[in-house]
Amino acid sequence: MASYPNGQSCPGAAGQVPGVPPGGYYPGPPHGGGQYGSGLPPGGGYGAPAPGGPYGYPSAGGVPSGTPSGPYGGIPPGGPYGQLPPGGPYGTQPGHYGQGGVPPNVDPEAYSWFQSVDADHSGYISLKELKQALVNSNWSSFNDETCLMMINMFDKTKSGRIDVAGFSALWKFLQQWRNLFQQYDRDRSGSISSTELQQALSQMGYNLSPQFTQLLVSRYCARSAIPAMQLDCFIKVCTQLQVLTEAFREKDTAVQGNIRLSFEDFVTMTASRML
């Protein structure tokens, strides 16, 4: 028997937490535009979202109020993943992309970063290239699990790579999660402690025990005297929690807060939703 606390309400279709459709890419919120949706962390969950943007859209300017302007996740002011090379991506050489300009429905800044990250000029971002481009606040590379999860989410062609449209959606997705990470990093340490994660999940609408939160931190954090969660693990945990919550919601057709499953149904539901 699985359950969520009484009093928590299941969101309607407009607030549906995303799964991963057969196409293998992340659709974004249902009201997002474009082939890939908006690529932002979705609205809704089991419980109301916190005021001011978590699991929805941020306050004006794209950054939750009270967040610092300095780098989080190795993302300096003016753009993610370090500075662009002088003279634009690839210096002054024409490169793979020619002079065609930014493709339709692609964020111009994301397009510039796509060109910079696409080291082999193939027109796609591989797992290796993505991992090399992403760093946490302590300058460690994003872990393989999170990078592979994001490749699977935004790889519409199931080729193991992300095209420019998928990267544009991924870029927005990363920016939104970075903003949320900043908001919940109360002590501005550059990492999320067990207490901060508990507060974050609570404000996102999840009524989970401190013991469960501590389990998440111990599972996804590097061993240290004071375990804390870097941005890559924060993205992994919150995204996976959303996906599993949606799987639960689909089974809870009576909106009673509990479901009854056979062991095989449980394993199937979990395996089919793991990113």
Curated annotation (Swiss-Prot):
The keyword Cytoplasm applies. Ca(2+) 1 binds at residues 118, 120, 122, 124, 129. Ca(2+) 2 binds at residues 185, 187, 189, 191, 196. One of its GO terms (molecular function) is protein heterodimerization activity. InterPro entries: EF-hand-dom_pair (IPR011992), EF_Hand_1_Ca_BS (IPR018247), EF_hand_dom (IPR002048), Peflin/Sorcin_CaBP (IPR051426). Sequence repeats lie at residues 21-29, 31-39, 41-49, 50-59, 60-68, 76-84, 85-91, 92-100. Keywords: Calcium, Cytoplasm, Cytoplasmic vesicle, Endoplasmic reticulum, Membrane, Metal-binding, Repeat, Ubl conjugation. It is a peripheral membrane protein. Residues 31-45 have a biased composition (Gly residues). GO terms for biological process: COPII vesicle coating; endoplasmic reticulum to Golgi vesicle-mediated transport; neural crest cell development; neural crest formation; positive regulation of protein monoubiquitination; response to calcium ion. One of its GO terms (cellular component) is endoplasmic reticulum. Ubiquitinated by the BCR(KLHL12) E3 ubiquitin ligase complex. Its main location: cytoplasm. Pfam families: EF-hand_6, EF-hand_7. Residues 21-100 are annotated as: 8 X 9 AA approximate tandem repeat of [AP]-P-G-G-P-Y-G-G-P-P. It is found in: Cytoplasm; Endoplasmic reticulum; Membrane; Cytoplasmic vesicle, COPII-coated vesicle membrane. Residues 59-70 have a biased composition (Low complexity). It comes from the Eukaryota. Heterodimer; heterodimerizes (via the EF-hand 5) with PDCD6. Dissociates from PDCD6 in presence of calcium. Calcium-binding protein that acts as an adapter that bridges unrelated proteins or stabilizes weak protein-protein complexes in response to calcium. Together with PDCD6, acts as a calcium-dependent adapter for the BCR(KLHL12) complex, a complex involved in endoplasmic reticulum (ER)-Golgi transport by regulating the size of COPII coats. PANTHER family: PEFLIN. This is Peflin. It comes from Mus musculus.
